[in-house]
Amino acid sequence: METALSTPVFARRNVAYACATLCCLLWGSSYPAIKSGYELFQIATDDIPSKVVFAGYRFLFAGALLLLFALAQRKPIARLTPTQFGQLTILGLTQTTIQYTFFYIGLAYTTGVNGSIMNATGTFFSVLLAHFIYHNDKLSYNKTLGCILGFAGVMLVNFHSGIRDFRFVWNGDGFVVLAAFILSAATLYGKRISQTVDPTVMTGWQLGIGGLALVAGGYATGGTLEVHSLTAVAVLGYLTLLSSVAFALWSALLKVNRVSMIAPFNFVIPVAGTVLSAIFLGENILEIKYAIALVLVCSGIWWVNK
């Protein structure tokens, strides 16, 4: 159970804004970190099973870390009904296993800059799904305009050498977009579960279950993960920490705040992903199309939540 003070703390606007910004900064930093991890663990671009193993260990460790944290807070992590455990299993397999399988594969076939912006489509998928799921969250003029602006930005980033040369790599950009859609649907499902299961416990179980499935699936299909340096371990450790902290915080924020208040902070993700990819991976962000695309994506998210 949560303490009496946890809900009002996360419900305070300044705390909620700070935590939401931190979550999105962490998620944005995952783009260059994942690509660096591939290099440090010497995972080839076409070695999909090893990428799945890499993802699995990240989330398995993150889930275990969160459950240990919940135990330290004396939260009951095993007092789950069969129905609740089934819900957490479904959440873990969708939000972690399936979603990140597409995400990791997709990121290997696109740039960190493209990946961070393509993944921003998740905000617009959330708006569209909410229209069909919640009676009090229908599409409006602002939301429709926001979706159009956001997808315009996503399309722009894939234009190369002029409008006639449109480039969209299905197993790269397409998989990142598909991962964003799956995450949006799973997040709405997780919001419902968090009303009966503590957000930290829920996130720990779903990351652990999803991560274990990724590890098993990766090894079963011929994947491996060999440690070649302490730097590689440090990168995996960073990805583990950002997953546990960001997902747990985000779940706690969504439980006690309106989605429309927290969602606008998603604009930090493509911005952070683009800037950090340029800094750590040496990718080019000096093309004017990237600046315009980021403005369109951020404007779209702002209009959706206006």
For each feature predicted by the language model, list its residue ranges:
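Hydrophobic/aromatic residues within transmembrane alpha-helices
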Residues: 37, 54, 106, 132-139, ...
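Glycine-/small-residue-enriched transmembrane alpha-helix faces in small-molecule transporters
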Residues: 1-53, 165-192, 212, 216, ...
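Hydrophobic transmembrane alpha-helices of multi-pass small-molecule transport proteins
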Residues: 66, 128-129, 141-160, 267, ...
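Hydrophobic/small/kink-forming positions within alpha-helical transmembrane segments
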Residues: 28, 32, 60, 92-97, ...
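Small-residue-rich packing faces within the transmembrane alpha-helices of Major Facilitator Superfamily
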Residues: 28, 60-64, 151, 211-212, ...
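Loop-to-transmembrane-helix transition segments
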Residues: 15-24, 70-71, 75-102, 171-179, ...
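Helix-helix packing/entry segments at the starts of transmembrane helices
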Residues: 57, 96, 100, 114-121, ...
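Transmembrane alpha-helices of multi-pass small-molecule transport proteins
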Residues: 40-97, 125-129, 182-186, 203-221
